[in-house]
Amino acid sequence: MKTLLLTFLVVTIVCLDLGYTLICHRVHGLQTCEPDQKFCFRKTTMFFPNHPVLLMGCTYSCPTEKYSVCCSTDKCNK
């Protein structure tokens, strides 16, 4: 009986972990990422000279541009 309960506990823990989704900051608020999006990012880009634009959110892969940050824990891209 104890073995059955232990097995049930392990299966429950594994199943709960499979449903985890990452939460990232956006410029305004939070974003719940899609299951395949494993990273949060923050990057600053210049669309016009002397006018930096901040981009934040979920991503499938880390950006490689200069002035970018990539991380993989909840709300890590503030």
Curated annotation (Swiss-Prot):
Disulfide cross-links: C24-C40, C33-C58, C62-C70, C71-C76
Positions of the record's site feature: Important residue for inhibition of muscle alpha-1-beta-1-delta-epsilon (CHRNA1-CHRNB1-CHRND-CHRNE) and neuronal alpha-3-beta-2/CHRNA3-CHRNB2 nAChR: H28, K43, H51, K66
InterPro entries on file: Snake_3FTx, Snake_toxin-like_sf, Toxin_cobra-type
Site positions for Key residue for inhibition of muscle alpha-1-beta-1-delta-epsilon (CHRNA1-CHRNB1-CHRND-CHRNE) and important residue for inhibition of neuronal alpha-3-beta-2/CHRNA3-CHRNB2 nAChR: F48
Tissue and organ distribution: Expressed by the venom gland.
Site (Key residue for inhibition of muscle alpha-1-beta-1-delta-epsilon (CHRNA1-CHRNB1-CHRND-CHRNE) nAChR): T44
Stretches that traverse the bilayer: none
Gene Ontology MF, one: toxin activity
Pfam families: Toxin_cobra-type
UniProt site positions, description: Important residue for inhibition of muscle alpha-1-beta-1-delta-epsilon (CHRNA1-CHRNB1-CHRND-CHRNE) nAChR: T45, F47
Leader sequence residues: 1-21
Keyword Acetylation annotated: no
Site residues by UniProt (Important residue for interaction with muscle alpha-1-beta-1-delta-epsilon (CHRNA1-CHRNB1-CHRND-CHRNE) and neuronal alpha-3-beta-2/CHRNA3-CHRNB2 nAChR): Y67
Localisation: Secreted
GO CC, alphabetical: extracellular region
Keyword annotations of the record: Acetylcholine receptor inhibiting toxin, Disulfide bond, Ion channel impairing toxin, Neurotoxin, Postsynaptic neurotoxin, Secreted, Signal, Toxin
Swiss-Prot/TrEMBL site (Key residue for inhibition of muscle alpha-1-beta-1-delta-epsilon (CHRNA1-CHRNB1-CHRND-CHRNE) and important for inhibition of neuronal alpha-3-beta-2/CHRNA3-CHRNB2 nAChR) positions: M46
SUPFAM superfamilies xrefs: Snake toxin-like
Cited function: This three-finger toxin binds and inhibits the nicotinic acetylcholine receptor (nAChR).
Name by which UniProt lists this protein: Short neurotoxin SNTX11
Organism, as annotated: Ophiophagus hannah (King cobra)
